[in-house]
């Protein structure tokens, strides 16, 4: 029996705050235009009480990590067309990451969406990866705003990527 090749489209975006209705509307239109299966966003700046503002038609499943202040915040949205069944959701109280483990289209998968703070971003990212290593498997996708250039194409200067960052890529 031949298995049909399928792909899964995941988009990610640092929205730098969603308190403005205009910005939320633009995000909604952008998400719909991408025709993706999963959308990961960083820096929502929404509190737990405001998370309903992330509603997008055709995207019922919205998983998020927020804090009490209007800072940070990450979310993962799953399109209704995706067969998604969560098994584990792990989030930090500061709204800097959310890890979702489950099945997507009957395939085991883990998605880790990170917003690393500007200060000590590399160490912060390493710590998150250490804290979540028991949930991370070979079918793990790490997305987000790491505030760290992971490759030469991410840099605006010709300065080389240091060894610590190269190790993070492995």
Predicted feature locations:
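A shared catalytic/ligand-binding motif for oxyanion handling
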Residues: 1-170
